[in-house]
Amino acid sequence: MGAILMSLIPKLRGLRAAGVLAAAALATACATPAQKSATADTEYLLTVSRPGLLHVIDMKTDRIARSCELPGKFGSGALVPAPDGRHAFVLGNLWEDVYGFELDTCKLVFSARQSEGDVTVKTVQSLAVSADGSELYTVQNPVRRGADRFEVLQPRLAVYRIADGLDAKPVRSFPVKRRITKIAATAGGEVILGGADVEAIDVRSGAVRTVSALASWDRGPGWLTPDAFAMHSQGEHLNEYVMPYVTAKFADDKQDMASAEWWWGMSRVDLATGKAETREIFPFQFVIFSLVADPRDRNILYGAFNTLSKHDIAKRETLKVVELDHTYYSLQLSRDATRVYVGGAGSTISIHDSGTLEKIGMIQLPGDMSTADVRVAWRRP
């Protein structure tokens, strides 16, 4: 996390862990008796929990339809649904390998082991699928392990053909900058790279362009350089990519932090066009880990961490804030936008009415989600 957010988190209350045994029992009770294929399901909530399970949750009932066992050790839990709504890809095995599953059956249909020989590759949440569903993208951070030293190598965007199935190898790779976390594919053949700045890379040529200048912006001495944070992706329902950031507007040339106006801002990328808007959206009053927009009104955003909040960015106002029972990292909306699902960190997904933010339900998982994404897979008719 960026330096500004890190300095604030110790002031916030910590995570209260859930009972794993009780969670396992409840999760088992919620699942269908034979974990049957649910061909009528059109909307799934997806997440990953320890010890290594991809959970497919029926959003009509808010019950676990099935849980797919991940090979290897628990990873980051980053995941991305395919455009067809029938498959999902998960980053596992200590942030190194990618596994693709058929959501109806839990069949493993894709795998990619990124480490090889004396080179260990880690991917930090960077996982995306092309708009046509044919390619998978990761940002690889390789390190060569020697007898007495580690050699940090050039990060790269790796491109895989999903049709290559198990034990797939990259078909192309291109050098990229460090600090890249969440990524997303555009309709025009680019991948959005969330790092110090928001950039886009052409997946055929490797050409890179700046989408939103953040760390490199030039707004003069009256503004603090933004501290951007990209961990979780929540924009598939609107085909967008959102990068939140924190900045400050100073009162004078003294650049006094105490008297400055602190703001949340965001870079918002339209994945259909690859174009972005970057602006301040509401005052900074508390830490938010993730933002998701309401499809009924794109000016309404929800945020989560120790609180669940609702914001009108047209008015640059915070409309409502409710305390959560523990820390959460990620959130999503149902397709009709009437329910907010807040997950990550612990072993529970908290369900809230999107109008009042009142808690209306909970989904218990058999283990904590840690840094796992919470994503929605919608099967088109």
Where are the regions a protein language model picked out?
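Bacterial N-terminal signal peptides
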Residues: 18-28
